[in-house]
Amino acid sequence: MSSPGEFYNSLPPITKAYGTLCFFTTVATQLGLVAPVHIALIPELVLKQFQIWRLITNLFFLGGFSINFGIRLLMIARYGVQLEKGPFERRTADFLWMMIFGSFTLLVLSVIPFFWTPFLGVSLVFMLLYLWSREFPNANISLYGLVTLKAFYLPWAMLALDVIFGSPIMPDLLGIIAGHLYYFLTVLHPLATGKNYLKTPKWVNKIVARWRIGAPVASVRQAGGVGAAGPGAGGGVGGGGAYSSARAPPESSNTAFRGRSYRLTD
């Protein structure tokens, strides 16, 4: 069994950085080093007092120390890591662009008063969960050891649990919307038309190359990287420059996670 340090060092760079920032943001608020209100997304303060840091800091706050906070961190460690090590393997720039696009989408949605929420960290985590569920739709998930379901339905099951326990559901809904928009633009629409309008910008690739983040970008995506949507096949999210217009292989080839169960609280 690996030590906590070895496990941490084994994490892929973008997921590790995001999870670390989320953890220390909560630590800082719990120790009183910074008040949550000073990092919240408050449009009036952003526009009138130019407190533009709020556009970024709100994305790293998952709430105070609690069971829900622990679950969100586990979701990053489980689903974010599996995405970055799976369909985004050797595509660090594409994964970073996905996170940037998701963050931007959430910020735009928050401009609408109905969708506004002061912190979008949970929404960004939920976006990762949604994309993971589309990538590995046939993985078996055990919810607290009580119910087993296909991963394709996990975001909706988590949403239902928040409804039952009286937790806010808007962050979950925002994450689903942002995740589906990214999935539509990088998988569904390219499969239908052969055109990908959300390729990873060159400046993102330059950042990754300049700072030597992650593995070098693969010139060609591995076969089976782009899959069909829906519970019948594991789609390949991420429409970076390495996007292939070929359709996914038959369902029988997408069996990497079929038959394996994961407990949410493991």
Swiss-Prot record:
SUPFAM superfamilies with a match to the protein in the record: Rhomboid-like
Subcellular location: Endoplasmic reticulum membrane
Stretch list, region Disordered: 235-266
Transmembrane segments: 21-41, 56-76, 95-115, 157-177
Keywords tagged on the record: Endoplasmic reticulum, Membrane, Transmembrane, Transmembrane helix
Tree of life domain: Eukaryota
Matches recorded under InterPro entries: DER1, Rhomboid-like_sf
Topological domains annotated Cytoplasmic: 1-20, 77-94, 178-266
Name of a matching Pfam family: DER1
Main location: endoplasmic reticulum
GO cellular component: endoplasmic reticulum membrane; plasma membrane
Alphabetical GO biological process terms: response to stress
Lumenal side: 42-55, 116-156
Record's bilayer topology term: Multi-pass membrane protein
Assigned protein family: Belongs to the derlin family.
Function: May be involved in the degradation process of specific misfolded endoplasmic reticulum (ER) luminal proteins.
Stated name of the protein: Derlin-1
